[in-house]
A protein has these predicted regions:
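Short linear motifs at protein or domain termini
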Residues: 1-96, 208-211
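C-terminal effector-binding regulatory domain of bacterial HTH transcription factors
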Residues: 1-3, 187-211
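Short helix-capping and inter-helix turn/linker motifs at the boundaries of alpha-helical repeat units
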Residues: 5, 165-168
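A short secondary-structure junction motif
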Residues: 17, 21, 151-158, 203, ...
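Charged, alpha-helical scaffolding/interaction elements associated with membrane systems
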Residues: 20, 55, 118-119, 183
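Short, flexible turn/loop "capping" segments at secondary-structure junctions
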Residues: 27, 59-60, 128, 169-171
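Alpha-helix C-terminal capping/termination sites
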Residues: 96, 182-183
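Conserved amphipathic alpha-helical segments that form helical-bundle/coiled-coil interaction surfaces
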Residues: 100-162, 171-179, 188-198
Length: 211
């Protein structure tokens, strides 16, 4: 399994917190505090801050961490529309190219379904990332892979979507996508991925409205 790079993982965690409203406009983000909270060194947090600043989500302060910038619904919609465009294309390409590891991933997902109530957050997130990056890899386009990696923001779990409910829906959607890829049905793989990301976007937007 491909491990989630620390910078990408932390960027995804912070991006999800920004989108859900855990961090609001004007809030100060302490590099040291976040590193301690996540149990990592300051280096990957600093790299995550730089990535978030490049996206216009935060403003870096010299030796003082960062300040959260205003985020509106259009920013979130634009972000997810890009994921829909690129990730649905990746799924279609994976179906055309073939994805040998699809069977193994489907087995892992079916196993996860059997023990859904005891599935840990980290286990779910690792499997979620493994499915998506497996599809990106099978698409066989390094530029596309890097763009999707930069857009990655992890699972869209929030108080409007209970964790178990999200796990159940997302896991079945992953199985559906991989089954289409396995059958080399590029058109359906594209559609299944579009619907998968659209549901994530809808959940994040619901969280945003209830902030």
């Amino acid at each position: 399994m491909e491990l989630l790079p620390a910078r990408v993982r932390i960027t995804a965690i912070l991006k999800k917190a920004l989108f859900s409203g855990e961090y609001k406009s004007g809030d100060e983000l302490s590099l040291t505090d976040i590193a301690a909270k996540l149990g990592v060194s300051r280096t990957p947090v600093r790299e995550a801050f730089q990535a978030l600043e490049a996206e216009g989500l935060i403003e870096l302060r010299m030796n003082k961490g960062a300040i959260v910038k205003p985020i509106d619904e259009k920013y979130i919609t634009d972000h997810y529309e890009m994921r829909i465009l690129l990730e649905s294309e990746a799924a279609a390409r994976a179906a055309k190219n073939g994805m040998p590891e699809a069977d193994k991933l489907i087995e892992k997902l079916l196993d996860a379904q059997k023990r859904m109530e005891s599935l840990s957050t980290s286990e779910y997130e690792d499997l979620n990332f493994e499915v998506h990056t497996g599809i990106w890899t099978a698409a066989d386009n390094m530029r596309l892979y890097k763009m999707l990696s930069n857009l990655w923001n992890g699972p869209s779990i929030g108080f409007t979507s209970p964790k178990l409910d999200h796990y159940i829906k997302s896991t079945q959607e992953h199985i559906n996508i991989l089954t289409c890829i396995k059958k080399k049905d590029a058109k359906k793989a594209r559609k299944e991925m579009e619907q998968h990301i659209e549901r994530s976007m809808d959940n994040i937007l619901k969280n945003f409205k209830f902030r």
